[in-house]
């Protein structure tokens, strides 16, 4: 994208051209806060602390991603940046990656969305001629956030309950639990 947009000058955490500054996320830079960020009692794995039901879910910068988050945030805070183009993967997770970064970085300016399924020069150029208001993707972001919050609530609560109840390191999750059930079912059939 940076090459197609003519961004060649290196800046902190990005590349700059005459019209655009391109930066990147390298996957998730922000995630839902761990249990102990809501309540210190939730740091201990104990049946008495379950269920863990935060009144409002919070996000935190992933510690290993802090440097890149700060680089993105620095680009967003530049005085010459008046609009943002979200160019993460076209899909639910890509929307979540971008929106959580923007929320955590405090971006309040206008935003548009690049929605492309190919990284060819032609696709990128065409995509930039058809940018849509980011608000048109709000429901996609909401669905991604709901999925992430549900995974946190079910995964952490059920994992802790199983581990505490059976005194063994066990885990449960939205995808892994039914997948394991299918494997067990298949194994029993053999």
Which functions belong to the PLM regions below?
Residues 1-145:
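Intrinsically disordered, low-complexity regulatory segments
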Residues 147, 151-190:
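Prokaryote-biased recognition of long, low-complexity C-terminal linker/tail segments
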């Amino acid at each position: 994208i940076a090459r197609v947009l003519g961004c060649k000058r290196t800046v902190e955490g990005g590349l700059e051209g005459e019209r655009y500054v391109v930066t990147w996320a390298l996957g998730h830079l922000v995630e839902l806060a761990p249990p102990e960020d809501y309540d210190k009692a939730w740091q201990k794995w104990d049946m008495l602390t379950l269920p863990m039901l935060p009144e409002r879910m919070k996000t935190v910068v992933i510690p290993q991603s802090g440097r890149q988050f700060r680089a993105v945030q620095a680009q967003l805070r530049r005085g010459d940046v008046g609009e943002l183009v979200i160019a993460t993967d076209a899909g639910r997770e890509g929307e979540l990656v971008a929106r959580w970064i923007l929320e955590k970085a405090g971006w309040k300016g206008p935003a548009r969305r690049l929605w492309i399924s190919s990284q060819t020069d032609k696709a990128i150029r065409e995509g930039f001629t058809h940018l849509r208001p980011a608000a048109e993707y709000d429901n996609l972001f909401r669905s991604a956030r709901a999925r992430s919050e549900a995974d946190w609530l079910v995964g952490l609560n059920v994992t802790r309950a199983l581990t505490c109840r059976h005194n063994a390191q066990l885990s449960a999750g939205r995808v892994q639990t039914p997948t394991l059930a299918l494997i067990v079912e298949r194994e029993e059939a053999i």
